[in-house]
């Protein structure tokens, strides 16, 4: 009997038809992004994420994030970061730097240890929200808790959150120093110290705070610095605080290959009319329009609305809850155009943005580089248009020289193959809903409208009302969201006009528009502009 059982056991083969890749079958992988990509992200060594010998649970998060193969910066940084060595990494905007430090951080964290083990510093609140969402999505199968904290929010909520296990803190330096200084955030076992947009974090306004934060970390911590530009302040910090850092420099050229740059000479009083002409002629999926001051941001947003286009705006003087809401809604495609200051030049990744317009030309090359990097993300196509006044001509020349790039005069017709894809509906949206606060992000009666491509920008009526009223207009009427954003129902397609980009009437102080609506308040109880009534019958 025993011999018979032994014979049967020897003949038994364990085979559940499993294959090495079978575990991928149950993953919730988003649709493949079929858009053309440039060498900024395709010039790799041919590695796969599996080649890094990371946990399967982390691989599951990577593939469910929509990643297929590592980009050049990820190929270079991830293996080194996994060894615990300090890193100085320089790579272009929009080439995957965030995942290059988040993936090794998630791999090295011990979920059973309830102490903070990784600190990720970023310069802006919006970038903190975005980075924390990447951490949560990539680490969703690991049981790792991520906390985001920034200035402008209540300290009480952060204190309560830190009473629970937190493995990664993502935030701005001032708030984290405040928490550490009050002995609320225990960084004694935080072995990973990461700075994204390191050049900004090591500017004079942040340097002292960064130096103080380092005192709360163990001496054998790992420091990783990532940025597109490395000024002398970064070298000074590295020499003082980093041990034999591994240097990565993938900046063979400063600008992204997929971005086409143009300029148009425009008198100040004609800029709004020029912008109107661009809207009518360009095939915009989403656009970001930059101004050099917060006052001009609000004024331009109101003028764009008077012209009949849906528009949000955002700047540093706004209430934090309103900034979060605008960022969340624009990221999810509720509106086509965003007017902002340099608040959103750092790290913000919105795949659907294919046009960046510098309504006000920046004063230096670094700001220009980060602005235009909001389009053409992850090797895709983008368009940057600069409205140049007579006073800007020397800045234009200096920026071209410093960046080693060419900004060409704008042609009468911009070929669509420079910045337009045939199927914009396939452009990836955020993997998960960017809920920063349930009460802020879930207004009733709101339509989540995905922008679609048209021959010109979508024109809608606009009237400034209360942002939070959540009312929806009937067909052909205006839907408005006053605090920082205006949007309309009943789109009217603009078929384009025979105009030059830099000629015509209208100015920043008085663009064309239809009937004027009631004057109401905008953000922060500031004085609002005149709304645009329904367009007159043609």
Curated annotation (Swiss-Prot):
Biased composition (Low complexity): 456-500
EC number: 3.6.4.13
Domain Helicase C-terminal: 258-418
Motif DEAD box: chain residues: 196-199
One Gene Ontology term, aspect cellular component: P-body
Reactions accelerated catalytically: ATP + H2O = ADP + phosphate + H(+)
UniProt biased composition (Polar residues): 432-455
GO molecular-function terms, A-Z: ATP binding; ATP hydrolysis activity; RNA binding; RNA helicase activity
Q motif, short sequence motif: residues: 47-75
Stored InterPro entries: DEAD/DEAH_box_helicase_dom, Helicase_ATP-bd, Helicase_C-like, P-loop_NTPase, RNA-helicase_DEAD-box_CS, RNA_helicase_DEAD_Q_motif
GO terms for biological process, alphabetical: mRNA processing; mRNA transport; regulation of translation
Region annotation Disordered: where it falls in the sequence: 427-538
Protein name from the UniProt record: ATP-dependent RNA helicase dhh1
Species assigned in the record: Botryotinia fuckeliana (strain B05.10) (Noble rot fungus)
């Amino acid at each position: 009997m025993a011999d018979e059982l032994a014979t049967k056991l020897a003949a038994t083969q364990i085979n559940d038809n499993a294959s090495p890749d079978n575990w991928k079958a149950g993953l919730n992988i988003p649709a493949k992004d079929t858009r053309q990509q440039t060498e900024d992200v395709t010039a790799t060594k041919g590695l796969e994420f599996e080649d890094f010998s990371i946990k399967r649970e982390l691989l599951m998060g990577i593939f469910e994030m929509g990643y297929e193969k590592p980009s050049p910066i990820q190929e270079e940084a991830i293996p080194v970061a996994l060894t615990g060595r300090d890193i100085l990494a320089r790579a272009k905007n929009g080439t995957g730097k965030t995942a290059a430090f988040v993936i090794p951080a998630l791999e090295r964290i011990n979920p059973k240890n309830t102490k903070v083990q990784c600190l990720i510093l970023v310069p802006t609140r919006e970038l903190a929200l975005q980075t924390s969402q990447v951490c949560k999505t990539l680490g969703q199968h690991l049981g790792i808790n991520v906390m985001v904290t920034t200035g402008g929010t209540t300290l009480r909520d952060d204190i309560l959150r830190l009473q629970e296990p937190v493995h990664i803190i993502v935030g701005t330096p001032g708030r984290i120093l405040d928490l550490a200084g009050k002995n609320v955030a225990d960084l004694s076992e935080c072995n990973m110290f990461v700075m994204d947009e390191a050049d900004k974090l090591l500017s004079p306004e942040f340097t002292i705070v960064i130096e103080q934060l380092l005192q709360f970390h163990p001496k054998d911590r790992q420091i990783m610095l990532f940025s597109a530009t490395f000024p002398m302040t970064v070298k000074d910090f590295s020499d003082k605080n980093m041990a034999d850092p591994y240097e990565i420099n993938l900046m063979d050229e400063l600008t992204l290959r997929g971005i086409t740059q143009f300029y148009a000479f425009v008198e100040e009083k004609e800029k709004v009319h020029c912008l109107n002409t661009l809207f009518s002629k360009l095939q915009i999926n989403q656009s970001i329009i930059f101004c050099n001051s917060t006052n001009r941001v609000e004024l331009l947003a109101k003028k764009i609305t008077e012209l009949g286009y849906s528009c949000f705006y955002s700047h540093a003087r706004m209430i934090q809850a309103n900034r979060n809401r605008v960022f969340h809604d624009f990221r999810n495609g509720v509106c086509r155009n965003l007017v902002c200051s340099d608040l959103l030049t750092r790290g913000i990744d919105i795949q659907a943005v294919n046009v960046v317009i510098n309504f006000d030309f920046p004063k230096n090359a670094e700001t220009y580089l980060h602005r235009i990097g909001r389009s053409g993300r992850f090797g895709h196509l983008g368009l940057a248009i600069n409205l140049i006044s007579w006073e800007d001509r020397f800045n234009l020349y200096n920026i071209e020289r410093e960046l080693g790039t060419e900004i060409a005069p704008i042609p009468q017709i911009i070929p669509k193959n420079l910045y337009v894809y045939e199927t914009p509906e396939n452009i990836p949206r955020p993997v998960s809903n960017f809920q920063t606060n349930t009460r802020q992000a879930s207004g009733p009666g709101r339509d989540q409208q995905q922008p679609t491509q048209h021959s010109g920008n979508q024109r809608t009526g606009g009237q400034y009302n209360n942002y939070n009223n959540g009312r929806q207009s009937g067909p052909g009427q205006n839907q408005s969201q006053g605090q920082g954003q205006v949007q309309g129902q009943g789109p009217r397609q603009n078929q384009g006009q025979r105009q030059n980009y830099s000629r015509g009437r209208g100015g920043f102080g008085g663009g064309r528009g239809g009937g004027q609506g009631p004057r109401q308040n905008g953000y922060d109880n500031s004085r609002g502009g005149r709304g645009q009534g329904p367009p007159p019958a043609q």
